[in-house]
Amino acid sequence: MNFTHIIAEKINQTLENTFDLDKLEKLVEKPKDLNRGDYAFPTFSLSAKFHEAPQKIALKIADEIDRTNFANVKAVGPYVNFFIQRVEFTNQLLKEILLNDDFGRNNQGAGKKIVIDMSSPNIAKPMSMGHLRSTVIGEAISKIAKANGYQTIKINFLGDWGTQFGLMIAAYKLWGDDKLINKNPVDELVKLYVKINKESETDKSLKDSGRAWFKKLEDGDPEAVKLWNWFKSVSLKEFQEVYDRLGVSFDSMNGEAFYNDKMEPVVKMLASKGLLTESQGAEIVDLPNLLPKDNYPIAMIKRSDGATQYITRDLASAIYRHDAYDFAKSLYVVGAEQKDHFDQMKAILKLAGDDWADDIEHIGFGMITMNGKKMSTRKGNIVPLVDVLDTARQLAAEQISEKNPGLENADHVAEEVGAGAVVFNDLQKDRNLSIDFNLEKIVQFEGDTGPYVQYTHARAMSILRKSGQQAILNTGVTFVDEEAWPIVSRLSAYPEMIKRAWQLREPSIVAKYLLSLARDFNSYYAHTKILVNNEKMQSRLSLVQGVCSVLKSGLNLLGVSAPNQM
């Protein structure tokens, strides 16, 4: 039952249908203090039309409105406050939750495709904590988009091309030990990459050697291509192990190399439209009227040596994806520092006459640090993501052993809790904020953590198991505790929360909702004896089951498991 819509309709009827229904619906609020009503309607915006004080308009609406579905409607100053008939509402809400697997989902995106560029680790380097944010934010946004009816295409735009591969090959040829590399491929390749970067600070010939090997790779030299393919193969194998643990999958793994033969057509297209200008031997696109001066109003398409730039490759990929997928939106889940780059790309596409560039969005996010330090492969201070997941699993196992020493499948649950802690911690803050990682804190079963929400779900499932009942809703809800009403109100907000999370491309909205629902339930559990065999138990168990269902559904939106026992 959509009370926001019902209230807007009833108000419009009272006002003789003189207002736009959608505009009225957007004005309906949910008061933070439930004593002021379950919903409230501010009348300030109606004052100009009726030439009356908002307080008078509120009184008129409260006196004349149809009160069906409401226990009470009253004016408080300029607000009209609505109090729902709680038993009837709760009964209908829980039926919607428990009898439909897709509660909260909608079809607003039916028939539309969303392309999501996410994760994008570099070949021959381990997946580090630096890749976590793009990966889990992209996965969560994909799940949220699907909950809003869209079809998603997740693309892992692998960093599998560039001069760094020339350096990697040069380092391998100089210092590579096949025995060590075969034993631990990516770690050894990283050591070689760090070493050649350090050595090249004093030996400039190493950079020249790297450039020469990359030129061989571009020209299809068999040895260079063989080594490049090997670097890629061992990297993808390690990446997949991490993705499996995070529950992340992709529809395309087309990386930078895929677009090697697609960039020259882009250059020719820009030239044919008179958009290219020569500047000191380089070819540029001038964007003075589309971007402010501090946003790089000149985009270099080709360097003076003929080499293409990242933006050339991104233009090629954007055009290819538009032609291949006919997307409604194309999202790039990339760090906030890349905003100017994507502004440039969109501006060039619009200059070229591609109005669909407006459907491209940069989904930026803040930096991630470990103990206040940024991570860099060149300097060697990287934190492999697999190590973080291993440590999180171990810390979760210790928590589980302490709280539930006899738990079956404890290792499996520890993996779910550890990985869930890492993912939830990343997603619970506004994605534009930077986050610092503290593993000891994020695996705790208390506080604003993923394990706290998971533990709440497990606790609620335990209550249902102890009740010995399966088909709980068969008699309906006949009673609603005063202390339970915040839970009911929170559950009813789930569908709108899913819409808002998609509108803002913001997974933290889901995470914050789940924390609030978990706190509401735990407060209720602390003050209410649920498993008491009386006329109230059935209604209370139905509520518990509703909480279980929504917690599990919400965690799934974030890519976090919901263990039944912890």
Swiss-Prot record:
Which reactions does this protein catalyse? tRNA(Arg) + L-arginine + ATP = L-arginyl-tRNA(Arg) + AMP + diphosphate
Q: Which InterPro entries match?
A: Arg-tRNA-ligase, Arg-tRNA-synth_N, Arg-tRNA-synth_N_sf, ArgRS_core, DALR_anticod-bd, Rossmann-like_a/b/a_fold, tRNAsynth_Ia_anticodon-bd
Offer a single GO CC term for the protein. cytoplasm
What is a GO molecular function of this protein? ATP binding
Keywords attached to this Swiss-Prot or TrEMBL record, sorted alphabetically, are: Aminoacyl-tRNA synthetase, ATP-binding, Cytoplasm, Ligase, Nucleotide-binding, Protein biosynthesis
Name the SUPFAM superfamilies for this protein: Anticodon-binding domain of a subclass of class I aminoacyl-tRNA synthetases (SSF47323), Arginyl-tRNA synthetase (ArgRS), N-terminal 'additional' domain (SSF55190), Nucleotidylyl transferase (SSF52374)
- Which GO terms of type biological process are on file? arginyl-tRNA aminoacylation
Top-level enzyme category: ligase
Name of this chain's protein = Arginine--tRNA ligase
Q: Which organism is it from?
A: Oenococcus oeni (strain ATCC BAA-331 / PSU-1)
